[in-house]
């Protein structure tokens, strides 16, 4: 089995190195990750300049671009063989609810799906890496289970792991995305020239953390696994939207 491993925290991130070591015994793993931390890069591709791919002393490949660039280059020109699975992470912090739209971690996995390769994104809730090895153990178990018993089609799974010791983690729960309150206001500061500068404010707290959501599962110590899809069509709105379009079209 072959795995393409990427992330959005950069090729030097502890989560990437730890997950690589855990996956080596179960698959042939190639690492292709961004050079720098690209948290919040979402699915951005670099189209305004050429990209360089280098190899570090530990054998990891890295690109001076985004997480999506990393996986795109690997799948369309660098790898000699098509991987059986794209894995992204482990991210330093959660990717739940609307976070998934901003997440470079999820985006790296999404790029695999764009080329028909199943993908799993892993995130460790909280940002202190205290229980990284525990999260790595769970991640490797999920990957091994998928390789032994694949889901139908080309799944995109978003996994969030509570920052807890392994023996305190609950079972794996299949969840839907919860919802957050809007982000907090930007933080305005002044640079040395007296000009205003802005920092993006912290993410909003959970608004829908009801049973069945990723927020609820993680808050109760469970590993959250959310199947995602690329089709953003609001299917329930289609009938009303068609009526609206016909009314407007006829009026003109």
Curated annotation (Swiss-Prot):
Domain of life from the UniProt record: Bacteria
Broad EC category: hydrolase
Cofactor: record remark: Binds 1 divalent metal cation per subunit.
UniProtKB keywords: Cytoplasm, Hydrolase, Metal-binding, Nucleotide-binding
Catalytic activity: a ribonucleoside 5'-phosphate + H2O = a ribonucleoside + phosphate
UniProt keyword Cytoplasm, yes or no: yes
Main localisation: cytoplasm
Cofactor(s) required, per the database record: a divalent metal cation
InterPro entries with a match to the protein in the record: SurE, SurE-like_Pase/nucleotidase, SurE-like_sf
One Pfam family of this chain: SurE
Sites where the protein binds a divalent metal cation: 8-9, 39, 91
GO molecular function, one term: nucleotide binding
GO cellular component assignments: cytoplasm
Catalytic activity, EC: 3.1.3.5
Transmembrane segments: none
Localization per Swiss-Prot or TrEMBL: Cytoplasm
Keyword Cytoplasm attached: yes
Role description: Nucleotidase that shows phosphatase activity on nucleoside 5'-monophosphates.
Xref: HAMAP family: SurE
Family statement drawn from the similarity comment of this UniProt entry: Belongs to the SurE nucleotidase family.
Protein name: 5'-nucleotidase SurE
Organism whose genome encodes this protein: Paraburkholderia xenovorans (strain LB400)
Top-level taxonomy: Bacteria, Pseudomonadati, Pseudomonadota, Betaproteobacteria, Burkholderiales
